[in-house]
Amino acid sequence: RTFPKKVSHFGKIKKVNREKVLRKPKDLVTAYPGHVLALDTVEKQRNGRRMYILTAIDIFSRTTFAIATRSHSSKTFAHFFYLVMQMFPYEIKTVLTDNGSEFKKCLDQLLKQNNITHYHTYPKTPKMNAHCESFNGTIQEEFVDYYVNLLFDDTTKFNEKLSQYLEFYNTKRVHYAF
């Protein structure tokens, strides 16, 4: 892989550094619903075919949203985030994602258009996005593993069942240990 080069005024060739991304502050505390929304992807494979479940969770209120797709491109995630903005009853101020390519280009453009701050976690630190990772584990254990055949056979029916599960998850399911 070649990196772009830059020539200094002395004639020496220098490597051009990549554009830096805004990292999540270590002391970030959510103060109200919509302050920080965490996004992530769950990937399932079967017979060489991949399906993706795009997930979003508001860290303060623990309100969630998810949808299954065949692609996890930046354009797909931008459309997903647009749906999230329509579904969530409050204004989103900050988005927290990992460093995946699906969170670049189109999603970044949508976030900039809506004046939403986009924080990235540090590389190889899933603990910085622990709420979303925990939700991903929960949704896989409680829902996806039971309907994995439906996920690959009929995505529309899977998404209908998923919306019913998310309604249960957001309104009736107990989230905290006693």
Positions of PLM-derived features:
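Basic nucleic-acid-binding interfaces
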Residues: T94, T117-T121, F152, Q164, ...
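Active-site beta-loop-alpha junctions of metal-dependent nucleic acid enzymes
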Residues: R49, A66-Y90
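An active-site-proximal beta-strand-loop segment
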Residues: P33-F65, S71
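Basic, flexible linker segments flanking DNA-binding modules
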Residues: R1-H35, Q109, T125
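Short, charged, surface-exposed loops that flank catalytic or proteolytic processing sites
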Residues: Y146-K161
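Charged, gly/pro-enriched flexible loop segments at helix/strand junctions
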Residues: E160-F178
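RNase H-like two-metal-ion nuclease catalytic core shared by retroviral integrases
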Residues: T97-K112, H118-E142, T156-K157
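Short catalytic-loop micro-motif centered on adjacent basic/acidic residues
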Residues: I67, K93-D98
